[in-house]
Amino acid sequence: MQEAPELTSAAEPASEAWRANEEAHRALVEELRGKLAAARLGGGERARARHTARGKLLPRDRVDTLLDPGSPFLELAPLAADGMYDGQAPAAGVIAGIGRVSGRECVIVANDATVKGGTYYPMTVKKHLRAQEVALENRLPCVYLVDSGGAFLPLQDEVFPDREHFGRIFYNQARMSGAGIPQIAAVLGSCTAGGAYVPAMSDEAVIVRNQGTIFLGGPPLVKAATGEVVTAEELGGGEVHSRVSGVTDHLAEDDAHALRIVRTIVSTLPARGSLPWEVVPAVEPKADPAGLYGAVPADSRTPYDVREVIARVVDGSRFAEFKAEFGQTLVTGFARIHGHPVGIVANNGILFSESAQKGAHFIELCDQRGIPLVFLQNISGFMVGRDYEAGGIAKHGAKMVTAVACTRVPKLTMVIGGSFGAGNYSMCGRAYSPRFLWMWPNAKISVMGGEQAASVLATVKRDQLEARGESWPVEDEDAFKAPIRAQYERQGNAYYATARLWDDGVIDPMDTRQVLGLALTACANAPLGEPQFGVFRM
């Protein structure tokens, strides 16, 4: 990309708009940091004190000890379950992410026993499964740091019986091991009931003496079922499983020892294959990423040139734009991020037929050349109206949606503003299986905006009343609309979305480049498949 033109910023740092944008974004980021700090504490001071009193490392200290010194950790869904379960499950009681262990990128899943004993709420299951999905798609070894009491029994109907519930964790382990994706477990505490299958179905397993326990039925269940009285250590401790049952392969003296053993295991894994694309030395953007706060309006309804974002994310701020004069409400082009080649698809307004055709064409190009795609989403949807329907906007939009769905290259999505309606589909929303998807704190996501939804439903009701010869006073209509607006505002919020794992996390806009770079490095572990496009309606 060294020959690509260098983007320059037209934003004015001295302007009132810049100052207002910056102030708004800083307030949003401050809120984000507060939420993240609270989630990182886990189950609270007393729970942490009990945990460490038993000689255990805290869950995040376990992850830090496992990782290569000084290496980054790309955490997944750190605010899962935010505001759910009466605030009793910060981060859904599990830490998940991608980190480097003995030089290899691995997916790490660490139970947080300070949160309800590490039991699995519905969102805990969803987060664990999401981490496994990331491992499968990117062919990353899995390391499970187990310290869990199993399913959260009061919500068993939302945790146990269905396809994407607790049992899917072990199904995934079996399938990934069969596909040559290593599965490694360290039992650092309880490993109860179905959870016992995590180490039992791993390629290699470590257990800590006098601390780790594995059993399908714990001492209370054994006593109730058989009358036998037995301690947890006698039933399923480290000595039993390392010397007698053979469920585990390594016996450690403490957490630190267990994590050293895991690092040794990872160091014995075969080297990964060649990279699927060329990676060159990274170059910092010429435009300062800190300028994202001022250059980008916090309100997604305010128009701006998305090249202001691209300039602050890509290497050297260099961007080889594709079809710059056609379909100008969609910006497409080639760049590099941390040395990785990328094709960027970025909203610059509402989607018309021309911009949808341009997007489909560009995605096909990237697929043909084996270049990962980065989607920068800020979209209110497709243009509507009689002329546009007659012009075939449905079939043109379908071309772009088909291209997004069928491309074989990794797709990374960043929601930097609004994500509404069919625009979400064309710009690789969660339903289109991006390898990763993040949101900025100002992002909004819903089938349409709250005002539009309220107006649509009010129009339907007004038509019904008029058909019966009844009137509808303005004040009654306003009262009807108000709760609809409030519902959409609440449910479209970035934190409502991330709590339910509709994304992989809410991030500081300034971290966009770093997050994308780490994700691209993870994606480079998996080979590209074969092109496989469906029918494009002409």
What are these regions, as identified by a protein language model?
Residues 1-538:
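Ligand-binding clefts of soluble mixed alpha/beta catalytic domains
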